[in-house]
Regions:
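Bacterial Sec-dependent N-terminal signal peptides
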Residues: 1-25
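A broad, structure-centric signal for solvent-exposed, well-ordered loop/edge residues
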Residues: 7-8, 104, 126, 366, ...
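A broadly conserved detector of short glycine/acidic/proline-rich loop/turn motifs that flank catalytic sites
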Residues: 10, 101, 123, 144, ...
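Extended, hydrophobic interaction surfaces within ordered domains
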Residues: 15, 145, 150, 154-158, ...
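Zymogen propeptides/activation segments of proteases
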Residues: 19-283, 461, 473
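Extracellular (secreted or membrane-anchored) zinc-dependent metallopeptidases
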Residues: 198-539
Length: 541
């Protein structure tokens, strides 16, 4: 559908969708074809290109959530509490849900109305939801198998009844441009002969301290929360809920907000110690501020949030692999153009935390801005053509070398390996790992083979899981020589095939099957027309 947005002089914002009004019996959600919002400037409402407009029965949802079991008391697939979630295509997906707090119990006692949950689809094991509910409303992410993430977010602040359901891929990044920078890039990659696990399937809980400078807090203020403290913490909880959904499933890493994180929500710009609007300066300041307020021994990693006085959002990590490292574990910061933290901004912060956990950039582009900025390209981990598309890529920010818009919510194989090494045997191994009942899956990529030039091919893996869990497969090219982009068929080195979303099928066609059938040539999946060697790795999840 194409939304129509009208802004009148009386600040009346009208949202219209082409979908007929709907009401599902017994549902928490009602579909709307139009919504009028009073008192909001256009800049406060950033709309995806396509969306589904909804009204939520808040009281009914609150009653349902009060019955959700605690995570420690039930397996997710055995929860009897069911929640229908509206998808952008007009359908609903039913999830079994349970509590999944991201705040330390002591912090949760101080803010009992801020809560987090997780769920698994009743009919598709690849659909997972991670959401939070608080006085600022419902904020949720659904991870799907092939369509990319779905988000359900409030239309505007101070309205907990009206929501948008949309695919992240339909969010126009030009509305909220993002930028990343990192220092100490350029480390060598782990040996590519490694064929083991990206992790050991043990859960590692890291104590996370998120600071919000006074400008971020003030921008979070509303009529019901004039100081902005509660809203800022609720927004941070939204962010960590979504990040945990990815970090837990990809890395068996859980982030938990420290017991006194509320002390890091500042309200006085004259005394908070931050240089708002400058992420690099804030990242350096954050270390001393957090150490001084909560103590260096009371957290494992920290990141500061501020407000960007210009356009868009920008983040930085002053180092690669700083988690658990006294003296540098708080040297990360992001300044945002929207304190509601849109999905793109949360992905940016997820990316910066990836640096703090030991991952480098994965893009191969070396000439297009912003990819060509000094110190950002790391040849040792440049396995993705162009801008790349995974979390540690520069998707959407590399001009003509953009593979796609928003980053996909998974890590490239090299990032999994870097972070896995860092938290198991490297400097990020400070938490005591918790054994889980989940067994490691096994996978076999098969043998090597030779094919004629310019010939489509397929790779097939064989996977097994002792627990009977549904598996996904992700085939990725593992050649990192720097080349010209888009890749050419005459390239004798470097990546010529992009990564694709993990799939339930163990088979990947190169290029993708629809283009093979149609006889077209995808820009980011290029068959070599000359003799060369290509390396591939498959990751099973």
């Amino acid at each position: 559908m194409r939304p129509i947005i009208l802004l009148t002089l009386s600040l009346l914002l009208s949202f219209s969708s082409l979908r007929a009004q709907e009401k599902t019996a017994g549902s928490l959600w009602e579909g709307l074809d139009k919504l009028e919002v009073q008192g909001y400037e256009r800049s406060q409402v950033n709309l995806p290109e396509e969306f589904r407009l909804l009204k939520l029965d808040v009281e009914q949802l609150q009653a349902l959530l009060r019955t959700a079991p605690e995570r420690s008391t039930v397996q997710l697939g055995q929860s009897t509490v069911l929640l229908d979630i509206p998808l952008p295509d007009g359908s609903y997906q039913q999830f079994r849900i349970r509590q999944a707090p991201v705040m330390h119990p002591e912090l949760a006692k101080k803010f009992p109305n801020i809560n987090s949950y997780e769920g698994q689809s009743t009919d598709n094991p690849f659909f997972r939801i991670y959401f939070a509910f608080s006085p600022i409303g419902f904020y949720g992410m659904v991870l799907t198998e092939q369509s990319g993430p779905v988000f359900i977010t409030p239309v505007v602040r101070e309205d907990t009844e009206h929501y948008l359901s949309y695919y992240e891929k339909d969010f126009d990044l030009t509305q909220e441009p993002i930028n990343c920078s990192v220092q100490s890039a350029g480390r060598p990659a782990p040996g590519l002969e490694y064929r083991g696990m990206a992790g050991d399937c043990q859960l590692r809980t890291f104590r996370l301290a998120i600071a919000a400078d006074a400008e971020f807090t003030a921008a979070s203020a509303t009529f019901t929360d004039p100081t902005g403290v509660n809203n800022a913490l609720a927004t941070i909880n939204n962010m960590v809920t979504v990040i945990n959904g990815v970090y837990q499933s990809e890395l068996a890493i859980q982030l938990q907000l420290v017991p006194n994180n509320n002390l890091l929500i500042f309200t006085n710009a004259a005394t908070d110690g931050y240089t708002d609007g400058n992420q690099n300066t804030m990242a350096g300041e954050n270390q001393g501020i957090v150490d001084g307020i909560i103590g260096s021994g009371n957290y494992d990693v920290s990141h500061a949030l501020g407000v960007n006085a210009g356009t868009g959002s920008a983040g930085v990590s002053l180092g690669i692999g700083t988690v658990c490292n006294n003296g540098s574990k708080a040297r990360g910061a992001t300044v945002v153009g929207n304190v509601a933290l849109s999905p793109g901004i949360i992905t940016l912060i997820m990316h910066e935390l990836g640096h703090q956990f030991g991952a480098d950039h994965t893009f191969n582009e070396s000439t297009q801005p912003i990819c060509s900025n000094a110190g950002q390209l790391n040849p040792a981990t440049a396995f993705e053509p162009g801008s790349g598309s995974t979390i540690m890529s520069y998707a959407g920010t590399c001009g003509s070398s953009n593979v796609q818009g928003p980053r996909d919510r998974y890590f490239h194989a090299i990032s999994l390996q870097q972070i896995g090494n860092y938290v198991t045997v490297g400097g990020g191994s400070c938490p005591v790992p918790t054994p889980t009942t989940n067994n490691q899956p096994t996978v076999n990529a098969g043998g090597d083979f030779i094919i004629p030039v310019s010939t489509p091919f397929m790779l097939t893996a064989t996977g097994n899981d002792a627990d009977g869990d549904a598996l996904t497969y992700c085939w990725e090219q593992m050649d990192n020589a720097i080349i010209t982009h888009p890749p050419q068929s005459t390239a004798t080195v470097g990546p010529v095939f992009r990564t694709q979303l993990p799939s339930a099928s163990p088979i990947r066609f190169f290029p993708n099957l629809p283009t093979v059938i149609s006889g077209t040539s995808p820009t980011w999946e290029v068959l070599p027309s000359v003799g060369r060697k290509m390396n591939f790795r498959v990751t099973v999840r």
